[in-house]
Amino acid sequence: MISPAWSLFLIGTKIGLFFQVAPLSVVAKSCPSVCRCDAGFIYCNDRSLTSIPVGIPEDATTLYLQNNQINNVGIPSDLKNLLKVQRIYLYHNSLDEFPTNLPKYVKELHLQENNIRTITYDSLSKIPYLEELHLDDNSVSAVSIEEGAFRDSNYLRLLFLSRNHLSTIPGGLPRTIEELRLDDNRISTISSPSLHGLTSLKRLVLDGNLLNNHGLGDKVFFNLVNLTELSLVRNSLTAAPVNLPGTSLRKLYLQDNHINRVPPNAFSYLRQLYRLDMSNNNLSNLPQGIFDDLDNITQLILRNNPWYCGCKMKWVRDWLQSLPVKVNVRGLMCQAPEKVRGMAIKDLSAELFDCKDSGIVSTIQITTAIPNTAYPAQGQWPAPVTKQPDIKNPKLIKDQRTTGSPSRKTILITVKSVTPDTIHISWRLALPMTALRLSWLKLGHSPAFGSITETIVTGERSEYLVTALEPESPYRVCMVPMETSNLYLFDETPVCIETQTAPLRMYNPTTTLNREQEKEPYKNPNLPLAAIIGGAVALVSIALLALVCWYVHRNGSLFSRNCAYSKGRRRKDDYAEAGTKKDNSILEIRETSFQMLPISNEPISKEEFVIHTIFPPNGMNLYKNNLSESSSNRSYRDSGIPDSDHSHS
């Protein structure tokens, strides 16, 4: 049985322990003075910190430490005791090594924009539950990653190593990785073992490296059975890669390479692919049937390629016309031959492909235009057209009309130049149409991708005003009917016409700018008689005035004899005027005196010569230093010329 005294002792002990533990609990939940804490989120970012502050609450889950100056020494050892922290943002700091003393259960670590050079097993093994590792914009190289550094990172799903110094893909990556970003490195070769075993990889980004077809190993991507997105943008490929994983690949990006051919089996079995981008390459044609296995394709981007619309591309026209409405194809615009430059491949008729076995004869007719002097209603203002290559023998016909075959829906086009940079397009339709596609491009310059300008006009309209064109330049204008489903009619041929904008001198020949731009100076043989007479009178007047001025200047000394240059007459200009008069005397300077001697024997008038003191410029001292003990009666400037104030006359 416990005595009352012992019971009181135990109660007092418990109370004392409570008051001792309570302050520790309060301290544990306190927030560092330089940070802001909000329900597990600790905001210590953008504070110019050099170390992680102490006293972070134990219930913290996310640490925002970015945009500081924290270095490796500034990471305290007690940081690893924060067992609830799952996300740490340490990007844009001063780390030069992979940080240690991190919480064990961290899942997301942002270390981009530091100067980290090495990745070691010791640093990664202490955070085995890491799922996302961001190491973009550091100095990691292939040799600085320790072999087996990731062998305990069994939960790693995202690894970002963009903009580092990698020359190859790091080996020994965990099988759990789902997204791997290696863009903007120096990778030139990828061997099959590099990606071996990454069966969970879904997204692989290799943009901006040094990869070519020789640097890609055979079937290097074939075993990536779960890969859904592959990006090889901005590399040096000359052919589309083959042996791609066909079971899951949905997006393939190949733009900005040097691809000039596509192997016939490049896209075989890619039945899940729905987006393919091969823009900005050197493709001129495509092998027939290259897209046959693309059952789910919905976005095909082929912009900025020098497509040659010859007989080899006729199958592409047929394939485009058979596509359903949901398929969006962009960039199949002819760049050659000359007669179809700037036209969409799907708009071409069969005879325009110049197939030798084709017996189709063109039914496009060109008739003389009927001038239309009526000014058009307010039109639209399209974007400027990119310049096109020179045409050796252009046959440009102004204000002409073009019609289609009588068996087709006839369109009669009339084009008239309104101003040097504006043309008026009008048309008449034989049958009602829902909409028409109107396109125009400039001829006569080097080929440029995406050169044609297009717009859709409704069937109710009958005219269009095109502005912002170049004066005195040839243009091709085409129209083709469209249906409401946005698909071209299979039996419609584009109706085209060539015209030329008016020269500038037809509208404003008197401005200086236009005269400078004209090849020959502006001439007007019909000058008014009054203008000729006025010009002659002006020339005679100018000649007489010049003669009078010359005579006054030549005989100015005669007038000077009747004038006395005294102190009361424009004192400030005496020296300036004296410098312009003819002087017939010589100033002789002897040892301590000077004398004016006339050249001729004519007597010198006393009042005709007056000597004035010439005031020196600012900063020049003409006075003798009173402190000097020299006995000379002359003081010198820097140039050694005797000072006139101390000369004897």
UniProtKB/Swiss-Prot annotation:
The keyword Signal applies. This is Leucine-rich repeat transmembrane protein FLRT3. Monomer and homodimer. Self-associates (via leucine-rich repeats), giving rise to homooligomers. Interacts with FGFR1. Interacts (via extracellular domain) with ADGRL1/LPHN1 and LPHN2 (via olfactomedin-like domain). Interacts (via extracellular domain) with ADGRL3 (via olfactomedin-like domain). Interacts (via extracellular domain) with UNC5B (via Ig domain). May also interact (via extracellular domain) with UNC5A and UNC5C. Interacts (via extracellular domain) with UNC5D (via extracellular domain). Residues 38-67 are annotated as: Interaction with ADGRL3. It comes from the Eukaryota. One of its GO terms (cellular component) is growth cone membrane. Residues 305-356 form the LRRCT domain. Keywords: Cell adhesion, Cell junction, Cell membrane, Cell projection, Developmental protein, Disulfide bond, Endoplasmic reticulum, Glycoprotein, Leucine-rich repeat, Membrane, Repeat, Secreted, Signal, Synapse, Transmembrane, Transmembrane helix. Detected in adult brain. Detected in embryonic rostral thalamus neurons (at protein level). Detected in embryonic rostral thalamus neurons. Detected in neonate eye, in the inner plexiform layer and the outer nuclear layer. PROSITE patterns: FN3, LRR. Pfam families: LRR_8. Induction: Up-regulated by FGF2. Its main location: membrane. Glycans are attached at residue 282. The chain crosses the membrane at residues 529-549. Residues 1-28 form the signal peptide. The keyword Transmembrane applies. GO terms for molecular function: chemorepellent activity; fibroblast growth factor receptor binding; protein homodimerization activity. The lineage of its organism: Eukaryota, Metazoa, Chordata, Craniata, Vertebrata. Functions in cell-cell adhesion, cell migration and axon guidance, exerting an attractive or repulsive role depending on its interaction partners. Plays a role in the spatial organization of brain neurons. Plays a role in vascular development in the retina. Plays a role in cell-cell adhesion via its interaction with ADGRL3 and probably also other latrophilins that are expressed at the surface of adjacent cells. Interaction with the intracellular domain of ROBO1 mediates axon attraction towards cells expressing NTN1. It is a single-pass membrane protein. LRR repeats lie at residues 58-82, 83-105, 107-126, 127-152, 153-176, 178-197, 198-223, 224-246, 247-269, 270-293.
